[in-house]
């Protein structure tokens, strides 16, 4: 898995902060917890020790994952671009022709996607269909429930 990963600036900074917290706070704390649990004697029936070792495994795994992800990541900077088409990182307002409702999505990476926050993955059916389209374009998207048709009514690079 050596492919590069596009991230928004917000997501990149969030991953960096999580990595710093794990290395500077969580790792030393779990090492201290292991030492304290070890001081209680018999490790074969020491639930505190087992829990701390499990937590240490999780923390070390997450540190590895974040280091790998950040090493392959690049930040998509939209600040110098004219918002004339849908690209990774753009915020798009759509008009759903069937429901006659407006929907706003931000096109993000897979790790950032959260439909409740209006963030959809660039690899999702809707995300893939929207990328490259311009203002006032009509876009048909095949979704599990059938085909949806949207009109792009606004594009922002935030």
UniProtKB/Swiss-Prot annotation:
Highest taxon listed in the record's lineage: Bacteria
Keywords in alphabetical order: DNA-binding, Transcription, Transcription regulation
Pfam families referenced in this protein's UniProt entry, alphabetically: GreA_GreB, GreA_GreB_N
InterPro entries: GreA/GreB_C_sf, TF_GreA/GreB_CS, Tscrpt_elong_fac_GreA, Tscrpt_elong_fac_GreA/B, Tscrpt_elong_fac_GreA/B_C, Tscrpt_elong_fac_GreA/B_fam, Tscrpt_elong_fac_GreA/B_N, Tscrpt_elong_fac_GreA/B_N_sf
One GO biological process term: regulation of DNA-templated transcription elongation
MF terms (GO), sorted A to Z: DNA binding; RNA polymerase binding
Family membership noted in the UniProt record: Belongs to the GreA/GreB family.
Protein's job: Necessary for efficient RNA polymerase transcription elongation past template-encoded arresting sites. The arresting sites in DNA have the property of trapping a certain fraction of elongating RNA polymerases that pass through, resulting in locked ternary complexes. Cleavage of the nascent transcript by cleavage factors such as GreA or GreB allows the resumption of elongation from the new 3'terminus. GreA releases sequences of 2 to 3 nucleotides.
Protein name: Transcription elongation factor GreA
Organism: Pelobacter propionicus (strain DSM 2379 / NBRC 103807 / OttBd1)
Gene: greA
